[in-house]
């Protein structure tokens, strides 16, 4: 198992690629919340932990938190992010 860090910015529709979005706009989520993301990860049956008091490096003034998720070694970060977006729609 490996750990993936998931910042809400990675799947946020309002962000550009330069601002940190990693998924295509077609599947990105409008204003994703940490609690909503964690809920979907839990439903997927994956082990995770939430870090609430952390700020996204590109926006160090804003505390948004992130989620650490344990996934299979064969799962890429982008593949996992796309799966989360599809599950949240």
UniProtKB/Swiss-Prot annotation:
InterPro entries: Signal_recog_particle_SRP19 (IPR002778), SRP19-like_sf (IPR036521), SRP19_arc-type (IPR022938). It comes from the Archaea. It is found in: Cytoplasm. Part of the signal recognition particle protein translocation system, which is composed of SRP and FtsY. Archaeal SRP consists of a 7S RNA molecule of 300 nucleotides and two protein subunits: SRP54 and SRP19. Involved in targeting and insertion of nascent membrane proteins into the cytoplasmic membrane. Binds directly to 7S RNA and mediates binding of the 54 kDa subunit of the SRP. Belongs to the SRP19 family. GO terms for cellular component: signal recognition particle. GO terms for biological process: SRP-dependent cotranslational protein targeting to membrane, signal sequence recognition. It holds the Pfam family SRP19. GO terms for molecular function: 7S RNA binding. Keywords: Cytoplasm, Ribonucleoprotein, RNA-binding, Signal recognition particle. It comes from Methanococcus maripaludis (strain DSM 14266 / JCM 13030 / NBRC 101832 / S2 / LL). PANTHER family: SIGNAL RECOGNITION PARTICLE 19 KD PROTEIN (PTHR17453), SIGNAL RECOGNITION PARTICLE 19 KDA PROTEIN (PTHR17453:SF0). This is Signal recognition particle 19 kDa protein.
